[in-house]
């Protein structure tokens, strides 16, 4: 059976042509909460088609190696693959992914049914073209969680307002975020030393990029001249972009917990759940689990990436 792969997502759905008589198919993705939700959703698919869905979920640290090896070796483990959006270009150029326009037309799949940002980032190659190599499986974005129970303490609210002149709460911009992080840095609460924020610093994969671009986008950085593709000089290294990178570094140096120099999703979650930090940056996909696990007096609040010069956030993988 010939494979027809669709990339899908910061995660990208890779689809294979599936024999209508197939009794089961296998889907591969990363091991995390959204995969568990997808497992529930596929029950409807099985009830409607009679086709069982098997799953192989790979831990995030091993995910890219496992999936890319599968593609490079033309493996037959998966019928569907939810991979990373960063793979679309190489997948299209080196023949791992098939242009799906005719398939979409035949099956009545309209890209107008998807968020334009996810179509641009997760489906097209070259970006912005009408050449579709994937369907967006999950358009995740970067946001923040904070210890609302600490923020609601009258003594902390009074102290913060006396020092900064505004209320302790959801930060309106990155300057306020920094004020709040430094306010909690090294502070003792309930007999334990606390810190400001768990932010992305991991350098082995996309971690640091996903973190620092959250600031760069908020400062108004653009990757390239919007009227001239791949003309990056003066855009990606604009004064706003440089200021954002310097600010992110300052936030790390002044507000991160000890040893948080190579951290990404799991490390940020652990720092937050263990009570080390007042804030964590992470993906929206994790917030239901964080809220569900609130205990021992912990009350979590959530907010979108703060604006600085503009309101913007990092789209997963982008």
Name each model feature, range by range.
Residues 7-16:
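Bacterial N-terminal signal peptides
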Residues 21-23, 47-48, 130, 150, ...:
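Extracytoplasmic/periplasmic substrate-recognition and gating elements
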Residues 23, 40-117, 121, 154-155, ...:
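Extracytoplasmic "Venus flytrap"/periplasmic binding protein-like
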Residues 25-40, 58-61, 140:
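Extracytoplasmic "Venus flytrap"
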Residues 85-145, 207-211, 302-317:
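Hinge/lid segment of periplasmic solute-binding proteins
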Residues 88-92, 284-303:
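A ligand-binding cleft/hinge motif common to bilobed small-molecule-binding domains
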Residues 123-138, 142, 173-233, 277:
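Extracytoplasmic/periplasmic solute-binding protein
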Residues 176-185, 214, 219-262, 308-311, ...:
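Glycine-centered hinge/linker elements that transmit conformational signals in sensory
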């Amino acid at each position: 059976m010939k494979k027809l792969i669709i990339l899908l997502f910061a995660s990208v759905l890779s689809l294979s042509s599936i024999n209508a008589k197939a009794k089961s198919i296998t889907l591969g993705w990363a091991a995390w909460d959204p995969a568990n939700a997808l497992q529930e959703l596929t029950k409807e698919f099985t009830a409607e088609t009679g086709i069982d869905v098997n799953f192989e979920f790979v831990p995030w640290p091993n995910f890219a190696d496992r999936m890319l090896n599968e593609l490079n070796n033309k493996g037959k483990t998966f019928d569907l693959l939810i991979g990373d959006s960063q793979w679309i270009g190489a997948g299209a150029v080196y023949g791992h992914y098939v242009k799906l326009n005719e398939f979409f037309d035949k099956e009545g799949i309209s890209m107008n049914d998807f968020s334009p940002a996810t179509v641009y980032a997760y489906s097209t190659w070259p970006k912005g073209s009408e050449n579709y190599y994937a369907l967006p499986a999950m358009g995740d974005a970067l946001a923040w969680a904070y210890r609302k129970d600490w923020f609601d303490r009258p003594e902390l609210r009074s102290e913060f307002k006396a020092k900064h002149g505004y209320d302790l709460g959801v930060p309106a911009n990155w300057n306020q975020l920094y004020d709040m992080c430094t306010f909690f840095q090294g502070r003792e609460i309930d007999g334990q030393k606390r810190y400001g924020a768990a932010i992305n610093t991991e350098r082995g994969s996309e971690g640091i990029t996903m973190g620092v671009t959250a600031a760069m986008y908020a400062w108004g950085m653009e990757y390239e001249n919007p009227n001239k593709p791949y003309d990056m000089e003066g855009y990606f290294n604009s004064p706003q972009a440089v200021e954002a990178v310097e600010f992110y570094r300052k936030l790390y140096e002044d507000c991160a917990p000890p040893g948080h120099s190579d951290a990404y999703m799991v490390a940020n979650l652990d720092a937050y759940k263990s009570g080390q930090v007042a804030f964590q940056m992470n993906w929206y996909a994790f917030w239901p689990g964080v809220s569900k696990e609130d205990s021992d007096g912990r009350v979590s609040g959530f907010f979108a990436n703060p604006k600085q010069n503009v309101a913007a956030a990092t789209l997963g993988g982008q």
